[in-house]
Swiss-Prot record:
GO terms for biological process: glycine biosynthetic process from serine; tetrahydrofolate interconversion. It comes from Lactobacillus johnsonii (strain CNCM I-12250 / La1 / NCC 533). The record marks 224 as: Plays an important role in substrate specificity. Catalyzes the reversible interconversion of serine and glycine with tetrahydrofolate (THF) serving as the one-carbon carrier. This reaction serves as the major source of one-carbon groups required for the biosynthesis of purines, thymidylate, methionine, and other important biomolecules. Also exhibits THF-independent aldolase activity toward beta-hydroxyamino acids, producing glycine and aldehydes, via a retro-aldol mechanism. (6S)-5,6,7,8-tetrahydrofolate binds at residues 120-122, 350-352. This is Serine hydroxymethyltransferase. Its EC number is 2.1.2.1. Homodimer. The keyword Transcription regulation does not apply. Its cofactor is pyridoxal 5'-phosphate. Gene3D superfamilies: Aspartate Aminotransferase, domain 1, Type I PLP-dependent aspartate aminotransferase-like (Major domain). It is found in: Cytoplasm. The gene is glyA. PROSITE patterns: SHMT (PS00096).
């Protein structure tokens, strides 16, 4: 075999995935479509270079251009979020969160984060995750009537449990989050406040959601999702002294060599996010999300959790359709709509089955969908879930999906 000869099986799978993305309406809220420039940066020769350490303080030689790349990513990130400190090396959002915990906590310390069925993330204290195994994790839920954050209850839990760290942010919450209320609770009990804004980072960057950066001690995020960059993580803060602890907690504390080709792709994405067109994009993401939510609210069998959305996603309760979240996910897959099953607040079904779906609009907006198109997608979902065994309905749904993806090809 010649060096560099392609594996036919591998490239067949890659081409098949490319076709799947082109032919599918992508509604997974954490997915998006990156630019060719982001992909080019990630596939560059930077993948060949080891660069343990930070710009100007490397353990290897030959890092002069790597330093320029990483410093650009840092500078763009700081400008994008008006932050004093940025670390762009975390391999993922989970690694970013782990790094912050390692910097601020000791094993056994108490953390207070959003529960999974309320919309929280595994790394916010789930018992099956490192965050719930290494630390004493306490979860807060939503107000059962409004299905929104219950700050009185969060404050009560904080006073009772005395956490060293309070975690704000979510992976499945559709409303504006009041960071200042979290700050007041954290100050009252003497806790650090960490915000995980992985899902809404793009909205924060454009001002479509209030920024946690001036309020929290530290902010973590992914660099994909609404930032439309490569898969990876980042840590921000306005506290430079805390930043020094985070730097050492990440390297050598949590990771070794950074993925500089991914950091280059992060820099390119942040550069794109700083352009005026990105603000227009995020505005359209929210318009599409609200349009879909309104269409679902007009359905007799689908309920939108909390009654609507303020951001890029919504959770829909499909209990009345008689279809589980798992079956709905598979059913929609069959008509080329990709979404994911999601627990609803107080869900009696397991997280592997669920009574809901999470719907997000970042990827369809990147393709060019506008409000009428978003409404059409919602109508297709409603009809499929209302008549899940009607072959005619499913065939028509697939045709309507095909019309939309042909109208808005991935560029």
């Amino acid at each position: 075999m010649n060096y560099g000869e392609k594996s036919p099986a591998l490239w067949d799978a890659i081409k098949s995935e490319e076709k799947r993305q082109e032919d599918t309406i992508e509604l997974i809220a954490s997915e998006n479509i990156v630019s060719d420039a982001v992909r080019e940066a990630q596939g560059s020769v930077l993948t060949n270079k080891y660069a343990e350490g930070y710009p100007g303080k490397r353990y290897y030689g030959g890092c002069q251009y790597i330093d320029k790349v990483e410093q650009l990513a840092i500078d763009y990130a700081k400008k994008l979020f008006n932050a004093e400190y940025a670390n762009v090396q975390p391999h993922s959002g989970s690694q970013a969160n782990m790094t912050v915990y390692n910097a601020l906590l000791k094993p056994g310390d108490t953390i207070l984060g959003m529960g999974m069925d309320a919309g929280g993330h595994l790394t916010h204290g789930s018992k099956v995750n490192f965050s719930g195994k290494i630390f004493n994790s306490i979860s807060y839920d939503l107000n059962p009537e409004t299905e929104e954050l219950d700050f009185d209850r969060i404050r009560q839990l904080a006073i009772e449990k005395k956490p060293k760290l309070i975690i704000a942010g979510a992976s499945a919450y559709s409303r504006i989050i009041d960071w200042q209320k979290f700050r007041e609770i954290a100050d009252e009990v003497g806790a650090y406040l960490m915000v995980d804004m992985a899902h809404i980072a793009g909205l924060v960057a454009t001002g479509a959601h209030p920024s946690p950066v001036p309020i929290a001690d530290v902010v973590t995020t992914t660099t994909h999702k609404t930032l439309r960059g490569p898969r990876g993580g980042m840590i921000l803060s306005n506290n430079k002294e805390l930043g020094k602890k985070i730097d050492s907690a990440l390297f050598p504390g949590t990771q070794g060599g950074p993925l500089e080709h991914v950091i280059a792709a992060k820099a390119q994405a942040f550069y794109e996010d700083l352009q005026p067109e990105f603000t227009q994009y995020i505005d359209q993401v929210i318009k599409n999300s609200k349009a879909m939510a309104e269409e679902f609210k007009n359905s007799k069998n689908i309920r939108v959790v909390s009654g609507g959305t303020d951001n890029h996603l919504m959770i829909i309760d499909i209990t009345k359709t008689g279809v589980t979240g798992k079956d709905a996910q598979n059913l929609l897959d069959s008509v080329n709509i990709t979404t994911n099953k999601e627990s609803i607040p107080g869900d009696k079904r397991s997280p592997f089955i669920t009574s809901g779906l999470r719907i997000g609009t970042p990827a369809i907006t990147s393709r060019g969908f506008k409000e009428p198109d978003a409404k059409e997608v919602a109508k297709i979902i409603i009809e499929v879930l209302d008549k899940p065994e009607d072959a005619g309905v499913l065939a028509e749904a697939k045709e309507r999906v095909n019309d939309l993806v042909q109208k808005y090809p991935i560029k």
